Amino acid sequence: MGYLELKNVNLDQHLLSRVEELYYNSFPPEERRPWNSVKSLLKREDIRYKIEVIQQNGKFVGFISSWDFGSFCYVEHFAVESSVRGNGIGAAAISQFVAKSQKGVVFEVELPHCGEMAQRRIGFYSRNGFDVHADFEYVQPSYGEGLSSVPMLLMSANMSDDLKISVVAKTILRFVYGVKKD
Protein backbone atom coordinates (compact mmCIF):
# COMPACT_ATOMS: atom_id res chain seq x y z
CA MET A 1 0.00 0.00 0.00
CA GLY A 2 2.86 2.44 0.68
CA TYR A 3 3.17 5.35 3.07
CA LEU A 4 -0.16 6.93 4.01
CA GLU A 5 -0.44 10.40 5.55
CA LEU A 6 -3.31 12.63 6.70
CA LYS A 7 -2.44 16.28 6.16
CA ASN A 8 -4.44 19.41 7.05
CA VAL A 9 -5.37 21.49 4.04
CA ASN A 10 -6.08 25.21 3.96
CA LEU A 11 -7.44 27.69 1.43
CA ASP A 12 -4.03 28.47 -0.02
CA GLN A 13 -3.15 24.95 -1.05
CA HIS A 14 -3.62 23.59 -4.56
CA LEU A 15 -4.86 20.35 -2.98
CA LEU A 16 -8.15 22.06 -2.15
CA SER A 17 -9.15 21.91 -5.84
CA ARG A 18 -8.54 18.14 -5.79
CA VAL A 19 -10.72 17.87 -2.68
CA GLU A 20 -13.47 19.88 -4.41
CA GLU A 21 -13.43 17.63 -7.48
CA LEU A 22 -13.61 14.43 -5.40
CA TYR A 23 -16.29 16.00 -3.17
CA TYR A 24 -18.59 16.67 -6.14
CA ASN A 25 -17.87 13.27 -7.70
CA SER A 26 -18.49 11.34 -4.47
CA PHE A 27 -21.59 12.87 -2.88
CA PRO A 28 -25.07 13.62 -4.24
CA PRO A 29 -26.29 17.24 -3.91
CA GLU A 30 -28.50 16.51 -0.89
CA GLU A 31 -25.46 15.15 1.01
CA ARG A 32 -23.10 18.08 0.51
CA ARG A 33 -22.97 21.77 1.33
CA PRO A 34 -22.22 24.33 -1.38
CA TRP A 35 -18.46 24.58 -1.98
CA ASN A 36 -18.37 28.29 -1.11
CA SER A 37 -19.77 27.31 2.30
CA VAL A 38 -16.95 24.77 2.74
CA LYS A 39 -14.39 27.48 1.96
CA SER A 40 -16.10 29.87 4.39
CA LEU A 41 -15.87 27.26 7.15
CA LEU A 42 -12.15 26.80 6.48
CA LYS A 43 -11.62 30.58 6.87
CA ARG A 44 -13.27 30.75 10.28
CA GLU A 45 -11.10 30.30 13.34
CA ASP A 46 -13.97 30.12 15.84
CA ILE A 47 -15.19 26.69 14.77
CA ARG A 48 -13.48 23.35 14.70
CA TYR A 49 -13.94 22.37 11.07
CA LYS A 50 -11.05 21.02 9.06
CA ILE A 51 -10.23 19.10 5.94
CA GLU A 52 -7.42 16.59 5.87
CA VAL A 53 -6.15 15.20 2.59
CA ILE A 54 -5.18 11.56 2.43
CA GLN A 55 -1.88 11.13 0.62
CA GLN A 56 -0.25 7.88 -0.41
CA ASN A 57 3.47 8.30 -1.03
CA GLY A 58 2.84 12.05 -1.43
CA LYS A 59 0.00 11.62 -3.96
CA PHE A 60 -3.56 12.83 -3.25
CA VAL A 61 -5.91 9.84 -2.87
CA GLY A 62 -8.77 11.21 -0.75
CA PHE A 63 -9.95 13.49 2.03
CA ILE A 64 -11.74 13.64 5.38
CA SER A 65 -13.71 16.71 6.48
CA SER A 66 -14.52 16.78 10.17
CA TRP A 67 -15.69 18.77 13.17
CA ASP A 68 -13.98 18.48 16.56
CA PHE A 69 -16.47 18.94 19.40
CA GLY A 70 -14.07 18.18 22.25
CA SER A 71 -15.59 14.92 23.44
CA PHE A 72 -16.03 13.53 19.91
CA CYS A 73 -15.25 14.19 16.24
CA TYR A 74 -17.92 14.16 13.58
CA VAL A 75 -16.76 13.17 10.09
CA GLU A 76 -18.95 15.10 7.67
CA HIS A 77 -17.38 13.71 4.50
CA PHE A 78 -14.88 10.95 3.73
CA ALA A 79 -13.93 9.95 0.20
CA VAL A 80 -11.19 7.99 -1.52
CA GLU A 81 -10.41 8.26 -5.24
CA SER A 82 -12.21 5.49 -7.14
CA SER A 83 -8.94 4.45 -8.83
CA VAL A 84 -7.42 3.34 -5.49
CA ARG A 85 -10.46 1.90 -3.72
CA GLY A 86 -10.23 -1.69 -2.54
CA ASN A 87 -6.54 -1.42 -1.65
CA GLY A 88 -6.93 -0.80 2.09
CA ILE A 89 -6.40 2.96 1.83
CA GLY A 90 -9.80 3.85 3.28
CA ALA A 91 -9.39 1.46 6.20
CA ALA A 92 -5.87 2.76 6.91
CA ALA A 93 -7.03 6.39 6.71
CA ILE A 94 -9.95 5.80 9.09
CA SER A 95 -7.70 3.92 11.48
CA GLN A 96 -5.19 6.80 11.46
CA PHE A 97 -7.95 9.37 11.91
CA VAL A 98 -9.49 7.54 14.89
CA ALA A 99 -6.09 7.02 16.53
CA LYS A 100 -5.05 10.64 15.96
CA SER A 101 -8.31 12.08 17.30
CA GLN A 102 -8.04 10.15 20.60
CA LYS A 103 -11.79 10.49 21.14
CA GLY A 104 -15.05 9.16 19.79
CA VAL A 105 -15.61 9.43 16.04
CA VAL A 106 -19.09 9.63 14.48
CA PHE A 107 -20.28 9.19 10.88
CA GLU A 108 -23.65 9.51 9.17
CA VAL A 109 -24.46 6.69 6.75
CA GLU A 110 -27.39 6.06 4.44
CA LEU A 111 -30.00 3.54 5.52
CA PRO A 112 -29.25 -0.03 4.34
CA HIS A 113 -32.39 -0.18 2.17
CA CYS A 114 -31.00 2.70 0.05
CA GLY A 115 -29.03 0.19 -1.98
CA GLU A 116 -25.93 -1.89 -2.31
CA MET A 117 -23.53 1.05 -1.85
CA ALA A 118 -25.20 1.99 1.45
CA GLN A 119 -24.91 -1.62 2.64
CA ARG A 120 -21.26 -1.78 1.57
CA ARG A 121 -20.52 1.51 3.36
CA ILE A 122 -22.11 0.26 6.60
CA GLY A 123 -20.14 -2.99 6.25
CA PHE A 124 -16.90 -1.07 5.70
CA TYR A 125 -17.33 1.04 8.82
CA SER A 126 -18.44 -1.99 10.86
CA ARG A 127 -15.32 -3.91 9.80
CA ASN A 128 -13.28 -0.90 10.90
CA GLY A 129 -14.62 -0.82 14.44
CA PHE A 130 -17.72 1.36 14.12
CA ASP A 131 -21.04 0.48 15.75
CA VAL A 132 -24.40 1.20 14.11
CA HIS A 133 -26.95 3.06 16.23
CA ALA A 134 -29.85 1.41 14.38
CA ASP A 135 -32.43 2.14 17.06
CA PHE A 136 -31.72 5.88 17.06
CA GLU A 137 -33.80 7.85 14.55
CA TYR A 138 -31.70 10.47 12.76
CA VAL A 139 -32.29 12.72 9.75
CA GLN A 140 -29.60 14.77 8.06
CA PRO A 141 -31.18 18.20 7.54
CA SER A 142 -31.23 19.82 4.13
CA TYR A 143 -28.02 21.53 3.04
CA GLY A 144 -30.03 24.24 1.30
CA GLU A 145 -33.09 25.42 -0.51
CA GLY A 146 -34.50 22.84 -2.91
CA LEU A 147 -32.51 20.00 -1.36
CA SER A 148 -34.10 17.19 0.62
CA SER A 149 -33.31 16.10 4.13
CA VAL A 150 -31.98 12.53 4.24
CA PRO A 151 -32.85 9.79 6.76
CA MET A 152 -29.54 8.37 7.99
CA LEU A 153 -27.96 6.17 10.63
CA LEU A 154 -25.23 7.28 12.98
CA MET A 155 -22.19 5.05 13.41
CA SER A 156 -19.52 5.56 16.06
CA ALA A 157 -16.23 4.23 17.36
CA ASN A 158 -14.25 4.93 20.53
CA MET A 159 -17.23 6.64 22.17
CA SER A 160 -17.11 7.28 25.90
CA ASP A 161 -19.75 5.27 27.78
CA ASP A 162 -21.17 8.44 29.33
CA LEU A 163 -21.67 10.21 25.98
CA LYS A 164 -25.21 9.54 24.76
CA ILE A 165 -25.88 9.31 21.02
CA SER A 166 -28.83 11.70 21.47
CA VAL A 167 -26.43 14.38 22.80
CA VAL A 168 -24.04 13.70 19.92
CA ALA A 169 -26.89 14.06 17.40
CA LYS A 170 -28.09 17.34 18.98
CA THR A 171 -24.55 18.73 18.82
CA ILE A 172 -24.17 17.78 15.14
CA LEU A 173 -27.58 19.18 14.23
CA ARG A 174 -26.93 22.46 16.03
CA PHE A 175 -23.35 23.24 15.01
CA VAL A 176 -23.03 21.53 11.62
CA TYR A 177 -26.52 22.15 10.25
CA GLY A 178 -27.69 25.13 12.34
CA VAL A 179 -30.75 23.27 13.68
CA LYS A 180 -31.74 23.98 17.27
CA LYS A 181 -33.63 20.98 18.58
CA ASP A 182 -34.72 20.27 22.16
Each language-model region and where it sits:
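C-terminal "cap" of GNAT-fold acetyltransferases
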Residues: 117-118, 138-182
